[in-house]
């Protein structure tokens, strides 16, 4: 039974009502060689080579799939540099000097409505694979693998819930590109031969609700409907969203496709629209840069590969207190990763950068055994027991506590009265459990 949900402090008002600033022409762009799912990669270009926007310039390798690396602007490859990736690790990045011509690779082409209507699921699978489309809500799971399912799909769910505090990138995307999202939903319905889709948002998003009710009315397509879910965290977790939207409760580890459901994030839908309509990979995305450490929190639409340093001073006004130590979080405060500096590159799956003044008074205290972490866990784990097992290096105990069920929602750390980063201990436990 999914019942352990909670209200968390909402800080979206900092930027939620602000339109996204377009910043698409930085002097240099940086493309990650590897990522969390693809630890190895080959480079197809050498220093001094000219590249086109959307050109395949390398190939990432995972255990069971390969993933093309695309240039996100036209220009000259000038070398390799190390920067922080969204996983919090220093990673090799391909550095491209922008020529500001935005010359597109010949592979980019606009398909006619007739050509799109003729595409099969197999055709679309190949397109999204070649465009390296992944889950853009942060999961980075290859979209083409979802398209390869042989299970019959009778419901497509679009996740526009964005339950993390601070982040409003998807909110702005939904308001600014609604027609692209609706068209992409139709492409997915065509691929899966599915006649029902729901766009899931939080019930408090009145502006999105108004926009989509009008658009769906104009489209006159009753196969797609809006689904307003409760204002809880972690309502964006696919298990909770599916339960709320369909009444179906997935078993632990069960894939949604086993129940005839396929779910996508709204950002992934815009990526699907670009891939199907223009044969174009993801070269731009919406992000939120916010937090109490900067003067002007903003939403942006940027090229993938942009350094946040290019945005902080010019658009965000710099730091409010430059002399203070900062906390930099890639992603949301609940599930994101911290990095030690602002040397951060925006990759395809970066949804936000949160910059906070470090609070040195927020010191971890001994556990008081209050049970808050246990009560708040949406998958019914015992985080405090997992933490104690990790501290004792008791691998057998760790495995019995089943930390692999953890979805890393961060509620155990959020609710901890002793300010213990319980989620970090559970992450370590997951590593031990896999050994």
Region locations from a protein language model:
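Short, well-structured beta-strand-loop connectors
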Residues: 46-59, 78-79
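Hydrophobic alpha-helical positions that pack around
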Residues: 195-308, 314-320, 332
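Acidic low-complexity segments
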Residues: 79, 84-141, 150, 206
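Histidine-anchored nucleotide/phosphate-binding helix
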Residues: 175-192
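Gly-rich Lys/Arg/Thr-decorated short loops/hinges at beta-loop-alpha junctions or inter-strand turns
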Residues: 104, 156-170, 293
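N-terminal, Lys/Arg-enriched amphipathic/low-complexity engagement segments
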Residues: 1-44, 95
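Ferredoxin-type iron-sulfur electron-transfer modules in oxidoreductases and energy-metabolism complexes
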Residues: 351-364, 374, 378-435
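Extended boundary segments
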Residues: 1-22, 79, 84-85, 249-252, ...
């Amino acid at each position: 039974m999914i019942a352990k949900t909670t209200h968390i402090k909402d800080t979206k008002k900092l930027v939620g009502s602000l339109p996204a600033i377009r910043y698409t022409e930085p002097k240099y762009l940086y493309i990650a060689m590897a990522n969390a799912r693809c630890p190895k990669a080959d480079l197809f270009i050498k220093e001094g080579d000219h590249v086109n926007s959307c050109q395949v310039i390398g190939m990432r390798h995972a255990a069971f799939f390969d993933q093309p690396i695309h240039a996100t602007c036209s220009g000259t490859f000038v070398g390799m540099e190390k920067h922080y990736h969204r996983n919090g690790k220093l990673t090799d990045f391909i550095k491209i000097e922008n020529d500001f011509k935005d010359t597109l690779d010949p592979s980019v082409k606009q398909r006619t409505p007739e050509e799109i209507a003729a595409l099969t699921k197999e055709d679309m699978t190949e397109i999204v694979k070649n465009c390296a489309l992944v889950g853009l809500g942060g999961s980075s799971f290859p979209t083409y693998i979802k398209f390869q399912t042989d299970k019959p799909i009778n419901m497509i769910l679009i996740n526009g819930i964005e339950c993390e505090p601070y982040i409003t990138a998807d909110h702005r995307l939904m308001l600014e590109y609604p027609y692209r999202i609706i068209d992409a939903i139709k492409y997915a319905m065509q691929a899966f031969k599915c006649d029902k889709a729901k766009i899931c948002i939080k019930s408090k998003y009145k502006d999105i609700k108004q926009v989509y009710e009008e658009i769906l009315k104009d489209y006159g397509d009753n196969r797609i409907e809006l689904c307003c879910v409760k204002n809880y965290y972690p309502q964006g977790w696919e298990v909770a969203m599916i339960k709320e939207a369909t009444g179906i409760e997935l078993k632990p580890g069960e894939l949604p496709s086993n129940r005839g459901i396929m779910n996508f994030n709204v950002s992934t839908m815009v990526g699907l629209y670009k891939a199907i309509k223009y044969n174009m990979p993801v070269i731009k995305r919406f992000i939120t840069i916010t937090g109490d450490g900067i003067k002007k929190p903003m939403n942006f639409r940027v090229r993938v590969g942009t350094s946040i340093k290019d945005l902080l001073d010019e658009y965000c006004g710099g730091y409010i207190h430059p002399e203070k130590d900062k906390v930099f979080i890639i992603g949301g405060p609940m599930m994101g990763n911290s990095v030690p500096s602002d040397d951060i590159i925006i990759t395809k799956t970066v949804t936000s950068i949160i910059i906070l003044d470090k609070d040195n008074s927020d010191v971890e205290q001994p556990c008081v055994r209050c049970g808050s972490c246990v009560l708040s866990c949406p998958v019914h784990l015992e985080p405090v027991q997992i933490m104690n097992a990790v501290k004792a290096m008791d691998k057998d105990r760790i495995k019995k506590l089943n930390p692999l069920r953890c979805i890393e929602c961060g509620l155990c750390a959020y609710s901890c009265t002793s300010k213990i980063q319980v989620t970090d201990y559970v992450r370590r436990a997951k590593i031990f459990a896999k050994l």
